């Protein structure tokens, strides 16, 4: 089944989930996705009907890519950094080199660079990404305590991977921005 959902709206509904709640997702029509959150301890059940987006249903195959660098950060810290940097600029430069991850942005009134020490070595790779979309993706923070920032040597894209308890994983793929002069 291919279903188009607005990630931002979906997270607005799912952020009420607690650790012991049961989440049920069903798609019975092309217009709505039914979401039910059940709490045994509170003896409550909340139902939502999320409107589905009308999308092109052709399948897009994501190629297998060897991700050269995997950096694990607390998801709340990464979300805060992205949110803070979006107050300064529109784009973030993510560089992994050696045992360091650097997050950098430039704006009209200020620049920011944050360096994070990493436990393992990595070849140098840099990519430029939209903070607008990263801030949407980091809304998955409420579902997972850590995020894996995955980069590949070709710098074609970035993957943010959230392992959601024993339910599975969320992966967000983001294309690297190409500078306007190229």
Locations of the language-model features?
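DNA polymerase processivity clamps
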Residues: 1-46, 69-182
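Conserved loop-to-helix interface motifs that mediate assembly, gating, or partner/ligand docking
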Residues: 37-62
């Amino acid at each position: 089944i291919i279903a188009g959902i607005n990630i931002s709206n979906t997270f607005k509904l799912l952020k009420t989930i607690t650790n012991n709640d049961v989440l049920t997702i069903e798609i019975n029509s092309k217009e709505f996705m039914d979401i039910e959150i059940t709490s045994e301890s509170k003896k409550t059940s909340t139902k939502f009907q999320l409107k589905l987006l009308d999308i092109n249903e052709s399948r897009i195959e994501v190629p297998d890519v060897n991700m050269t660098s995997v950096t694990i950060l607390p998801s709340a810290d990464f979300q805060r950094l992205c949110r803070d940097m979006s107050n300064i600029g529109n784009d973030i430069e993510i560089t992994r080199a050696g045992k360091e991850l650097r997050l950098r942005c430039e704006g009209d009134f200020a620049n920011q660079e944050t360096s994070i020490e990493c436990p393992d070595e990595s070849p140098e790779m840099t990519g430029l990404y939209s903070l607008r979309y990263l801030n949407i993706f980091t809304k998955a923070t409420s579902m997972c305590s850590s995020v894996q920032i995955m980069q590949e040597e070709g710098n074609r894209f970035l993957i943010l991977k959230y392992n959601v308890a024993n339910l599975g994983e969320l992966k967000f793929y983001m294309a690297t921005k190409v500078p306007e002069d190229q």
